[in-house]
């Protein structure tokens, strides 16, 4: 049976104009580094796109009552990690699915659960003109801070910070009263030196390495790889930093350095443009004229995640941020982060494609082309 044509009228193709080049180039780099890893990455791509189409047809707007259940299920999984989690590299972050060798990292689906719950709560209680006051702020903060605290205990400082930045970034952008955000800012500044003393030794070492005049070995090799790429990059055979394994974790945490060694400064500029374009396109859904707060918050949350992940990862490889193990979104080797983002984009496309059913913009406004369409209209007027 043919699908209603309005579904495809509202389907936003532009994110995939940004995403597909990322996946193609990423696969090329991973294949050049290891054919075995590229085969695994191909499997992750297949799973990610399969889940995209499965999730795309889930009626999220009708599942309000289930969003709390999803959230608490993810929180329970995070809590179980502390009791029966699997340890890797000194961190206890995974659960082993019974009777299989498959592991699940609950900190990935919890990002989806937090974002959906925030979108639901903001939808039923939109921000007033002057922004949220303490009551609503504290209520929303609880749902952000609880899973972040459980993730921090694993320990996984990087992911915990990502959750906090996404959650509180949404609240700051949609609006908080001055008497809320100003005391919080002061408290954050005062508490930062105190919080440092509660960090693990390896986390303190990463900060010390970042602040020292000489970068640590990993960052130094990354900077050398980036500098050696020149303006147009090198052939595969000439990429000595990657070829001779000087560059650590070249296909995951430091894949940006590998990419710049291969494609040079010009390639880096194009990669920046893709991430900035994708982030802005999603961010500008916030300025649609309708009152579809569920859609706006989901798009805003994905925009923040894309921007923060890419900014922190690139800054890390340049020695401008501590090494925290944050992947380059839709680019680094691995399945967890990629599948999470594909599910998030599936949810966004579902909210766009089926919104005519709920009376939210029966005609597409600028969902198909985002801020680019707005720019074209402005230039033409």
Curated annotation (Swiss-Prot):
GO terms for cellular component: cell division site; plasma membrane. GO terms for molecular function: lipid-linked peptidoglycan transporter activity; peptidoglycan glycosyltransferase activity. It catalyses: [GlcNAc-(1->4)-Mur2Ac(oyl-L-Ala-gamma-D-Glu-L-Lys-D-Ala-D-Ala)](n)-di-trans,octa-cis-undecaprenyl diphosphate + beta-D-GlcNAc-(1->4)-Mur2Ac(oyl-L-Ala-gamma-D-Glu-L-Lys-D-Ala-D-Ala)-di-trans,octa-cis-undecaprenyl diphosphate = [GlcNAc-(1->4)-Mur2Ac(oyl-L-Ala-gamma-D-Glu-L-Lys-D-Ala-D-Ala)](n+1)-di-trans,octa-cis-undecaprenyl diphosphate + di-trans,octa-cis-undecaprenyl diphosphate + H(+). The chain crosses the membrane at residues 11-31, 40-60, 66-86, 102-122, 132-152, 156-176, 180-200, 263-283, 297-317, 328-348. Signal peptide: none annotated. GO terms for biological process: cell division; cell wall organization; peptidoglycan biosynthetic process; regulation of cell shape. Pfam families: FTSW_RODA_SPOVE (PF01098). InterPro entries: Cell_cycle_FtsW-rel_CS, FtsW/RodA, RodA/MrdB. Pathway: Cell wall biogenesis; peptidoglycan biosynthesis. It comes from the Bacteria. Belongs to the SEDS family. MrdB/RodA subfamily. This is Peptidoglycan glycosyltransferase MrdB.
């Amino acid at each position: 049976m043919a699908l209603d044509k309005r579904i495809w009228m509202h389907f936003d193709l532009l994110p995939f104009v940004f995403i597909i080049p990322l996946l193609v180039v990423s696969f090329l780099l991973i294949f050049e580094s290891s054919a075995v890893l590229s085969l695994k990455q191909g499997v992750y791509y297949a799973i990610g796109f399969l889940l995209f189409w499965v999730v795309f047809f889930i009626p999220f707007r009708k599942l309000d009552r289930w969003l709390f259940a999803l959230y608490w299920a993810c929180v329970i999984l995070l809590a179980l990690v502390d009791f029966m989690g699997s340890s890797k590299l000194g961190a206890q972050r995974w659960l082993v699915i019974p009777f299989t060798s498959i592991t699940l990292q609950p900190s990935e689906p919890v990002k989806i659960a937090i974002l959906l719950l925030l979108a639901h709560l903001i939808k039923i209680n939109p921000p007033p003109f002057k922004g949220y006051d303490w009551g609503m702020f504290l209520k929303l903060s609880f749902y952000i801070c609880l899973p972040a605290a459980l993730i921090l205990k694993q320990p996984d400082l990087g992911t915990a910070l990502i959750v906090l930045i996404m959650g509180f970034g949404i609240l700051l952008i949609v609006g908080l009263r001055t008497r809320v955000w100003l005391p919080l800012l002061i408290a954050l500044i005062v508490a930062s030196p105190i919080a440092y003393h509660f960090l693990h030794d390896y986390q303190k070492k990463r900060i010390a390495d970042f602040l020292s005049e000489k970068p640590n070995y990993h960052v130094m090799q990354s900077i050398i790889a980036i500098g050696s790429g020149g303006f147009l990059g090198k052939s595969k055979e000439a990429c000595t930093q990657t070829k001779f394994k000087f560059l650590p974790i070249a296909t995951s945490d430091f894949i940006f350095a590998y990419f710049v060694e291969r494609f040079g400064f010009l390639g880096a500029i194009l990669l920046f443009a893709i991430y900035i374009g994708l982030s802005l396109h999603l961010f500008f859904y916030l300025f649609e004229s309708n009152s579809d707060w569920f859609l706006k918050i989901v798009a805003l949350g994905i925009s923040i995640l894309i921007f923060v992940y890419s900014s922190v990862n690139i800054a890390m490889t340049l020695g401008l941020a501590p090494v925290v193990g944050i992947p380059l979104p839709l680019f680094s080797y691995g399945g967890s982060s990629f599948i999470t983002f594909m599910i998030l984009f599936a949810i966004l496309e579902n909210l766009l494609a089926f919104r005519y059913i709920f009376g939210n913009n029966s005609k597409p406004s600028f969902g198909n082309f985002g801020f680019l369409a707005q720019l074209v209209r402005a230039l033409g007027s």
